[in-house]
Amino acid sequence: MEYTVIKKDWSIEFETTSQQEIEDYIKVHKDTIYQVICRHDEDAPFHVYWSK
């Protein structure tokens, strides 16, 4: 699974393939990030994983 943190201006802030790493990142940065999107692989569509 690929996770991508998006800022409010739609720029990418952080990317990872680790669910634990993204959970930890959200806990620390939840006030400054806009959305986290995820997808299973390069050919799969994106889905919202977390949203402010």
Task: Tell where the protein language model's regions lie, with residue ranges.
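Short, mixed-charge low-complexity intrinsically disordered segments
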Residues: D9-E15, K27-K52
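A short beta-strand micro-motif
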Residues: E2-K8
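Short amphipathic alpha-helices within nucleic acid-binding modules
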Residues: I22
